[in-house]
Structures are given as C-alpha cells and as structure tokens.
C-alpha cells in the first residue's frame, strides 16, 4: 500500500480512520473505523444514493459495532488484516480500470464486501449486490478515470456545487 498512489481524499480518510481508532483505543484500524470515517464524509453521497444505502442508519450500525471492539493501550497502530486485504482488492479493481490513484469509492466497495461482520450486516440490511454496487460506481464516474490526486473531487461536482443558471 503506497500512500502516494491514493487520492488526496483517501489519504485524509485513512488519517482520520487512524485517529478514530486511536481515540477509541482500538488495537488496529479495522473495517468499522474506515467505514465510520467514510460515512462521516460527503465524498460518496452520490454512490450511497445510487445503491440505496441510508448513510445515517449505516453510520449508526457501524458505531454500535465499534463499541464491541476490545480496547487496547497500544500507541503503535496498524491496519487490520481485513483492511489491508480490502486495500489490495481496491488496488486490483483500480488497476483493472486503468486508474493511477486509488479512490475512496474503490476502498469503500472493497470494505463493504470484505469478510467482516459489519460488512455482512450492511450488505444484508440494505440488500446490496456486489456487481450492482460496482456498476453504480462506474456510472457515477461517468467514464472519468482517477489519474490525478484530486480527481475524486471532480466526480459529481456539478451536481454538488452547480445550479441551473437558466
């Protein structure tokens, strides 16, 4: 995992997840830490809408699960095996789509369909299908490739910041 190959937004999400795990005294950055940080951000709101995921409800589920993680006093925090594997899966997907930078969306989708309990619960609760979610992400991108560190900021920018001038 190379931080220089991550979008600026993903770098921020990762740092926020590390800080969240530390503040919650988790022994490692786990799927719940990554998902909580992603759900607190607005970068994927368009994807959540497309796949029918209620961000508020999902955030509640993740926070409840986070309370069940054992506490640790370690100051040297690493990524859990599930999160590492999710980053690898996301990188593979990004490579298949000729992308230079790893995005929050590709990591989110890999996290969503990893083997963690919370991921399985989210998939079950919101009746999510892996192929449909990846297809929704490709549609959201509308053919855009993530080839600069801030490419992610431009996806759905018109919808987010634009207004009808007519």
Segments from the language model and where they lie:
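Histone-fold recognition with a strong bias for associated Lys/Arg-rich disordered tails
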Residues: 1-166
